[in-house]
Each structure stands twice: as C-alpha cells, then as structure tokens.
From Swiss-Prot:
It is found in: Cytoplasm; Nucleus. This is Interferon-induced GTP-binding protein Mx2. Residues 61-70, 79-88 have a biased composition (Polar residues). One of its GO terms (molecular function) is GTPase activity. Residues 125-132 are annotated as: G1 motif. Its main location: cytoplasm. Residues 1-89 are annotated as: Disordered. The gene is MX2. Residues 622-713 form the GED domain.
Amino acid sequence: MSMSYRALKFRRHAPTSTQHHPKEDMNFHQQPPGLPGPALGQTMSPPPWQMGESNPDFLPNNFNQLNLDPQQPEADGGQQRSKGSENNLYRKYEEKVRPCIDLIDSLRALGVEQDLALPAIAVIGDQSSGKSSVLEALSGVALPRGSGIITRCPLVLKLTKRECEWTGKITYRNVTQQLHNPSEVEREIRRAQNIIAGNGVGISHELINLEVTSPEVPDLTLIDLPGITRVAVENQPQDIGLQIKALIKTYIQRQETINLVVVPCNVDIATTEALSMAQEVDPDGDRTIGILTKPDLVDKGTEKGVLKVMQNLTYHLKKGYMIVKCRGQQDITNKLSLAEATRKEVMFFQTHPYFRVLLDEGKATVPLLAERLTTELIWHINKSLPLLENQIKEKHQRATEELQQYGDDIPSNEGDKMFFLIEKIKLFNEDIEKLIEGEEIVIETESRLCNRIREEFTRWVLILTTNIEKVKSILNEEVSKYETKYRGKELLGFVNYKTFETVVKHYLGQLIDPALKMLQKAMEIIWQTFKDTAKKHFAEFCNLHQTVQNKIEDIKTKQMAEAANLIQLQFRMEKLVFCQDQIYGVVLNKVREEIFNSVGKASENPQSKHPFLNNQSSVSSIVEIGVHLNAYFTETSKRLANQIPFIIQYFMLQENGDKVQKAMMQLLQETQHYSWLLQEQSDTATKRKFLKEKIFRLTQAQQALYEFPHFKSI
C-alpha cells in the first residue's frame, strides 16, 4: 500500500470539524487523479484531457493512481472485488505510465541530456523555502539539511514505485553506490557533493543521480536545484548568488522542463526570487507550478491572502498552485516519521477553517501533489516524444558528419601505420588528380579550379584585344615618329620595315608584365586550392600537415620560376617578328580589304577624321604600315592567347600537381618518421572519442525510442 494511499485512507477515519462541510469526503473517480478542478476565479493549464477531452491513450478511462473510494466495502466479497479492481488499475498503471518515465530516465542515464533537453520537472526555491521538506515527503528519504547552501549539485531524484523492499542507488562520475537503508541517503549525498564541488560551499553543474525504489513512493523523476541565495556568507564566493542563478537558469529555461517553484506561505509571493526567475523564462506560466509550503506558519488574519494565491488571483500561473504541509524542524528533532507526517498533514487541512476547501478541491497534501506531478510529467513526456525523436536524428547525423572529418583512430602497430598513411596519401592524391582533370566535386556556390583559372585566361584575351586597339588608335602618331627617325633613302609612300618592326617589338614588350601577373594570379589560385586540399586530409596531423604544406610551397616556387622563365622566353622569341607566309598572307589580305574599304568611305567625306587621312602626304605609307601592323598583331594575339595559358597550365597545374603527388609517395619511404608524421593535434583524439561516445548514446537513444511500446501510437 503506497504512502499516499494510507495517508488519504487515514483521512476517512480522522475526526472532523464541528463545522458542516457536506462534501468533505472526496470521490476521486469524478475526474482524473491529481487534476483538481479550478477554484473560484482560478484558471489552470492542466494537460488537455483536463479541459473536457478524453483521457490520453496512456491512461485508462477509470485510472486513478491512488484509487480511493470513500465508501467502505460492507462485506468480504466487496473487499475482494475492491482489491481486484485496485490490482487491475495498478496493472494498467504499470503498463501505461511507468514505461514513459523509464524511457526518459534511460535516456538520461545514457547521457543524452548532454546533447539535448529531456522532459523533466525541476524544483527551485529560495533558501529556507521548504524545498527539501517537499522532496523528502515525496521521496520518503531524508535529504541534507542545514543553514547556507545545502544542495550544491543538481540532484536527479528518480522515484520508482514497486512492491519490493526499499532499495536505493546513488551515481556520480564513475561512482555507483548501492544503498540498503533510507538513513544512508543524506550521508552519501553529502559525500558526493564534497567529491564533486569540493569541501566547503562551492557549487557544480555536475549531476548526482539518486534512485529510490519502494512501494511507498510515487513514480516520478525530479531534478533538485540549489536554493537561491542573495548574500554570500562565510567562505562563499562573492558571486555565489549569480553562480546559482546561472545553474538554475540552464534547467528552467528549457521548454522541455516543468518548473516546480516552492514558496513559503508566510512570505510575500511577489518578492520571491524563485518565482521571479520562473516568470523570466516562462512569462505566461505555461510550464510553471507553484507549491506553497509552511501553511501552519501563516499569521492569523493572512489566511485569505494565501487562498487568493491558491485561487490564482495574486500571481497567475496557468498550471496553478498546490499547497503542502511537511515536517518542521521540531518534527525532525522529535524523529517524526514521514508516514506520520503525512497523516498529520491530512489532519491539518481537514480541520483548518480556511484551508480545508483546498483539500476538497484536490489542491492540498503531498500525496495529491505526487499524483499531480506524475500526471503532468507523463503528459509532458508524450507531448515531447515526436520532437525528441527528430532532435536525436538530427544531432546523430551532424555528429556522424563531424566525426568523418576527424577520420579513424591512429593504429599503434608500425605496419598498420604504413597502411594507414598509404590510405591517407592515396585519398589526397586522388583529390589532386581530380583538380588537375577538372573533375572535383564542388558545392553550388563554388567553381572548379580549372574554371577559376580559365577566368584569368579570359582576362588575358581582353588584355591582348586592348593592346591591338591601342596600336590602332595611335598608329598615325607612332608611324610619323618612326618615319622621321628611321626613314632612309626610300621615296615617300614606301613602307619602312624598320618602322614596322620597331612598333611591333614595342607593343609586344608591353604584354610581358600582364602575362607574368596572370601567372602570379593563377599560381595563387592553384596553390591555395592545393593547400586547402592538404588541410582537408591532414589538418589533424600537425607534423604531416606541415610537411605536406612545405612540399607544396617548395614545388610551387620551382614551378613558378620555370613558368616565368618560359613566358619571358616566349616574348623574347616574339621579338623575331615571324609568321608563316601562307598564314600571314591570308590575314594580310583580309585586313587590307577591311581597312581600304574603311579608308575609301572616309575619303568621300571631307569632314572625316580617319587617322589615316590626317596627313595626306604620308597617307599611303601610313595605310600600308597600318595594314601590316593590324594583320601581324591579329595573328600574334591568337598565338599568345593560347601559348601563355598553355605554359601556365602545364607548369602550374599539370606538372605541379604531378610533382606534389610524387612527393607524397616519397613520404612512404621515410618509415622511421611514421609515428612523427601521424602525431595528432592534442585535442583531435579527444574530439574523436567525444563524437564516438555521442553517436553511441544517440544511437542507443534512437533504439530506445524505437522499442518504446507506445511511441507509434502517440
């Protein structure tokens, strides 16, 4: 028989007040358990089935965790039927409710909470709010008490209702301690906090897990957080208040968390820090439940103020409030048992002239609080499962992709290291080869290496075209200057070959710098791409990565010098002014036809400013030399438009890539350096281990969700 069952069964035999209350006995079959109807003026936000909807799939229609009927059976047969009904409901409860809580507890045990938020109930309160007393009443075990900060680490309190002997287990870091008696709990929690947070008054974000299995506890999992303090005392850090608030906020700000805010009845609720923090992260109170404690300490005449709070008229929370009376310090001194304290609690509310109505409404006593919290948690879990599945799937995929970037673990055997290095170099060389052939895979916003180089070659063609147009635009001036300087005994109108040759050499010489700049630009593009490829494959191996970068740099420098020399050689050869007769003749005739047609039309127009007509005395000479210059530059530009890119592609891409691949293969001959080359960065192995552990627990979580019997029906 559960503690809550015995407590409320006791109520049926407790003495009643002399005042008349016709509906003092409760019939819990009138509505689902722990889901009290709102008092006058109170608006609550219970799970959906409380608002006129049918019970959810995970609760039977006649389900009641406490299963209380105020009418006593009149005969043994009635008792047997009642007991059979109770066992049947309990079996349905075990089938429908327990798996939900076990699922989330198993995910939490796997460490999934490191990766995403799980549905939970977080308990917060100011110091001396009665938070520990509430948790003690729910769990049936004594928790650390005293002045100052008592809860110094988040405590996950997992309560499991089972018909067996009391058992407990505390887990933290690599420690798992079995507990055989409730009296051991307080001592072991203090020991765990000292190990984690140190002896003293410091706090830690590290979790302590306490599991309690007993027939006297509800099925519930809570997270107890440190009490909120405003002023540092004794040896506490001056910012201890900020530290505690930051810790609490990490839990209560999660949308998956139900915030259980514990507030004493004998304080102004508007001044409580805990409720203020809850409102900050949950302004509408959608996931906040208020718990009022210490109703026996309320000053006479202020009871109505407490009732207004309970009726949601003072500080509105959609989920409303519950009120409990737990053991006080005198009760603890007198060693009052928790079971007896529960009976006294029921008696207190039954006989209280103001608060008895709260008992009638199902908003008072620890057993009803336990029932309410269990129902809220189950509903919250079922609501969160589809989103939880998607989050686990997404994080598993991202972790898997990230792990691929770190590669496999480094083998310890020297022979295995060679094969490991061979595989690494093979993959790198394959990517270099794809770059050379223009077959690498790129994302939509990027462009292949060959295409980026081709863009530079396109600019080179524009430079050559601009050079031809420049020659045309200043032809009259240039030819006149060279005619004056180099003309010999030939008559007016005869072409001076020296003039033609000088103009050609001068303007071809102006193309050397643009060609070398194009080489430099193409080299930078190729060099950066090779470096990025090396980083992709070897970034986690600091020595190997640096070695490869050095080889890429050395080879690039040599190839750059060879390509530059060949480009300069090309322009030195261009000074020979040569073109095959059959090729030049065709181009010359075509250009002559175009130019003379243009000049003929211009001569018919007296106002024409054609450059060839500005000096009539030398028109024939200028026109003729212009024809030859135009023809020669047209053909030379075609030659240079291809030849310079050929040189760059061969030396800086093809041969450069081949030499890099060969240099990588030569690394395999340095067997004595394998260990040095494969030395990872300090945090790489740690990251790989972390990601593997993350993937493992997320895989386990996916499996747990898949095996959850109710998941497909949610």
